[in-house]
């Protein structure tokens, strides 16, 4: 299909980015792993990247799930209609930036970008952006972004939540720290549920502009307190055979880390090593990001 588009001259109307590559030469791997990855699992990766170049990808390294970051440059404006399919990027664009995008399939994403149009339904409409859940945050401390997102995602599934009380822990404004928190929070709502849009009272742009007018009639209520977060935390199963097995590799950055997260985690690890009198971490650790520092 992509070759047919290229041969017919139907390239994208505007430059685009793509999701992360499956392989990174900076990640440790064995000879056998390299052989299997490059000759079997991802043998078509080079061909795929050539196709994306011909279709109009932004640049040779524009492979990230956080394309909306300022450092990347694929940042939509409020109200702009998108043809995206990466779930964590869709929920961020809708919620934090106020753009409009459905949780598209890869084919809809592809075709929408080529022709410059997408079907108008769901989260592209005013009615589809109304919240059918009110989520009340009643925790005694700032909730972990991923855990809170998981709890809300599993509860509301594909519905739109209007979140009350989280602004208390985010400082009351949409600054870089709040955006980073909401990036990780939103990704969890999208992966543990199917959330494509959330509103945070006094924080996200549509919630600031419209307030409680965004809440639909007969909206359901979900209260998140310390006990509820603990319940969700304890509900996660151990998926490996040996619970006490030693990890071989640690990955951090899904979605990709922001520049500030890279700086913060580098400082945290460096300081912890210094305090422990160690020169290296005991488990090889990879920070995932498109940004190079």
Positions of PLM-derived features:
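A generic, well-ordered mixed alpha/beta core segment in the N-terminal half of proteins
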Residues: 11, 18, 22-116
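Intrinsically disordered, low-complexity segments enriched in small residues
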Residues: 1-11, 52-60, 86-286
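Conserved small/polar residues in nucleotide/adenosyl-binding loops
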Residues: 291-293
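A cross-domain feature marking catalytic cores of carbohydrate-active enzymes
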Residues: 16, 202, 289
């Amino acid at each position: 299909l992509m070759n047919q588009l290229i041969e017919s001259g139907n390239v994208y109307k505007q430059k685009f980015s793509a999701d992360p590559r499956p392989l990174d030469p900076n990640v440790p791997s064995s000879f056998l792993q390299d052989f299997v990855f490059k000759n079997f699992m991802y043998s078509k990766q080079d061909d795929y990247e050539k196709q994306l170049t011909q279709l109009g990808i932004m640049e040779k390294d524009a492979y990230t799930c956080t394309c909306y970051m300022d450092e990347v440059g694929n940042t939509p404006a409020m109200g702009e209609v998108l043809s995206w399919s990466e779930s964590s990027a869709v929920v961020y664009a809708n919620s934090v930036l106020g753009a409009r995008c459905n949780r598209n399939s890869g084919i809809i994403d592809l075709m929408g970008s080529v022709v410059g149009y997408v079907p108008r339904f769901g989260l592209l409409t005013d009615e589809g952006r109304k919240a059918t859940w009110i989520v009340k945050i009643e925790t005694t401390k700032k909730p972990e972004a991923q855990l809170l997102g998981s709890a809300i995602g599993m509860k509301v599934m594909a519905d739109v939540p209007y979140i009350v009380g989280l602004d208390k822990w985010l400082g009351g404004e949409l600054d870089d720290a709040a955006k980073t928190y909401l990036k990780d929070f939103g990704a969890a709502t999208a992966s543990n549920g199917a959330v494509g849009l959330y509103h945070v009272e006094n924080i996200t742009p549509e919630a600031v502009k419209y307030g409680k007018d965004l809440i639909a009639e007969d909206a359901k209520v979900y209260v998140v307190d310390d006990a509820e977060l603990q319940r969700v935390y304890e509900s996660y199963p151990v998926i490996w055979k040996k619970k006490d097995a030693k990890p071989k590799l640690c990955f951090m950055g899904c979605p990709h880390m922001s520049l500030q997260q890279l700086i913060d985690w580098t400082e945290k690890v460096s300081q912890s090593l210094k305090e422990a009198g160690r020169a290296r971490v005991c488990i090889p650790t990879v920070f995932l990001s498109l940004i190079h520092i």
